[in-house]
């Protein structure tokens, strides 16, 4: 139970992007400088075996819903497979209903258009970039880590400074404005995700140590994050909010490391995208001075799906009747309760494609054993580096864990299937709508050589102005647009970068939207489609 004086604690969830378990000094990295995160680790409670999904959107969906990402629609990172279904109930929605002020600063990556944006899913304030990161096809032209173009509550504008500094400053300002109310801040940095862009004052320190450029810049971006965490913690103290604020730090998956680069990973096997522990075991520590004993470490296994029920439990916020969660509250563990902890098995899977394939890049993990791809078995107590496959010695464990996995994949797949949610056109919530290659379907990439389409819902019948935007470098003689029975084309002048179709009548309903360029019989995708009712 939570004392009345400690009810409704403030919540700050810090999630970094592609920072691995070994990318912290407190986890044994002999090179990186992370004093603020080390302090948070020392002053909080640390989960030694905390797990996320192998890549980012799936982790974010599970954090926001307390459910396995396969239930939510967010099964991958792009091509329409990172959009979370709008009927999923989210942590900020539940906290907002409990009287919390809610704000997100940084990376959402669960849908760029209505009704799937962060501002549609419970965040009352949202300063975010599109898609999976800055300087990607989902972003606005001229995007980058310095002076980025960001959406603030749906309004796009260029912001001065470095992305992580901007997001942290906005979070601190939000906290100051709402210090008299309980608040939930989701500070989700896009750093240290590639491209590796950071000030020379940060990277120079690591380059001087003789590190390769990739590692040096990655560590530099993490040290910048650490400096910003220090600013955030200092602001809590200055505002008198430190005691009853829960600060959670974790990362979204294992480290992203290029082939041939040797980076410290605390002895864990493999990297981002893998279901070996190097891909899914992540740092996680929580500081709550009012209730948690500093310096404790928890050996019990936990995962991203557990944070929503844990935080709701800490806040006394109720769950809606009938809402099914996969996670469980970790609050008894955090408070040091002596009650026995239930045994359970967690499941993780990720690969490209429109739906999961059984036994492809998957694992089932209990407190002791881990089954990888249905055939490899590891004793994680005796072999935390997952080097010795003992499947042949324990066929009964393999059979039991395979049965558990098969029941799990059938269950999560039956939730709603894997058809993507539709982007809505012509609503009051978003007009105009900009479609990007982030969410197109039918391709296996988002480069100029690829061609895709968008699954949309025309919410309001009427006339729309439609603009196709593209690079002048592309050879193109004609621009084409098609939605339902509407099929339009227009000749292009040499060097053109846009094509406008005016007052196009679109009927209400579900439809497939296509837009492409054509030259010499070859089709290429456009960069953006803008639709204004």
Question: What are these model-derived regions, one by one?
Answer:
Residues 1-373, 380-410, 417, 434-450, ...:
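Formylglycine-dependent sulfatase
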């Amino acid at each position: 139970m939570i004392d009345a004086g400690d009810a409704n604690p403030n919540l700050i969830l810090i999630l970094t992007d592609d920072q691995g378990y070994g990318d912290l000094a407190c986890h044994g990295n002999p090179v990186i400088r992370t004093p603020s995160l080390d302090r948070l680790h020392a002053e909080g409670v640390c989960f030694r075996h905390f797990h996320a999904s192998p890549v980012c959107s799936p982790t974010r969906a599970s954090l926001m819903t307390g459910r396995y990402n396969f239930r939510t629609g967010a099964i991958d990172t792009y091509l329409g497979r990172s959009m979370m279904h709008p009927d999923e109930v989210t942590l900020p929605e539940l906290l907002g209903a409990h009287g919390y002020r809610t704000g997100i600063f940084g990376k959402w990556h669960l849908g760029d258009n209505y009704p799937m944006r962060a501002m549609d899913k419970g965040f009352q304030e949202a300063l975010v970039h599109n898609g999976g990161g800055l300087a990607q096809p989902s972003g606005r032209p001229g995007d980058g880590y310095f002076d980025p173009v960001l959406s603030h509550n749906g309004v796009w504008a260029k912001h001065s400074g470095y992305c992580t500094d901007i997001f942290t400053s906005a979070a601190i300002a939000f906290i100051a404005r709402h210090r008299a109310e309980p608040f939930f801040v989701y500070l989700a940095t896009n750093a240290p995700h590639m491209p590796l862009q950071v000030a020379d004052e940060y990277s120079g320190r690591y380059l001087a140590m003789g590190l390769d450029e990739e590692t040096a810049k990655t560590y530099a971006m993490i040290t910048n994050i650490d400096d910003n965490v220090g600013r955030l913690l200092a602001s809590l103290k200055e505002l008198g909010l430190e005691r009853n604020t829960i600060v959670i730090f974790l990362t979204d998956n294992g480290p992203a490391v290029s082939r041939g680069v040797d980076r410290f990973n605390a002895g864990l096997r493999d990297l981002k995208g893998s279901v070996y522990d190097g891909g899914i075991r992540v740092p996680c520590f929580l500081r709550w001075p009012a209730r948690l004993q500093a310096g404790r470490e928890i050996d019990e296994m936990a995962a991203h799906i557990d944070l929503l029920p844990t935080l709701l439990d800490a806040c006394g916020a109720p769950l809606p009747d009938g809402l099914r969660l996969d996670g469980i509250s970790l609050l008894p563990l955090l408070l040091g309760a002596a009650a026995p902890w239930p045994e359970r098995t967690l499941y993780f899977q990720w690969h490209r494609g429109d739906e999961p394939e059984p036994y492809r890049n998957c694992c089932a993990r209990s407190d002791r054993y881990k089954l990888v791809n249905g055939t490899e078995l590891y004793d994680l107590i005796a072999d935390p580096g997952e080097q010795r496959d003992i499947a042949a010695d324990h066929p009964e464990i393999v059979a039991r864990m395979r049965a558990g996995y098969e029941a799990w994949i059938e269950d999560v797949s039956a939730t709603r299937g894997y058809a993507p949610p539709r982007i809505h056109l012509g609503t009051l919530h978003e007009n105009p709508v900009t479609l990007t290659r982030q969410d197109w379907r039918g391709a296996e990439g988002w480069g100029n050589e690829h061609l895709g389409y968008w699954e949309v819902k025309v919410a309001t019948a009427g006339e729309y102005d439609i603009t196709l935007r593209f690079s002048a470098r592309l050879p193109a003689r004609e621009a084409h647009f098609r939605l339902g029975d509407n099929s339009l084309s227009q000749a292009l002048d040499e060097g053109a970068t846009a094509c406008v179709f005016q007052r196009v009548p679109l009927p209400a309903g579900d439809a497939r939207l296509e837009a492409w360029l054509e030259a010499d019989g070859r089709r290429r995708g456009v960069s953006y489609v803008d639709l204004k009712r």
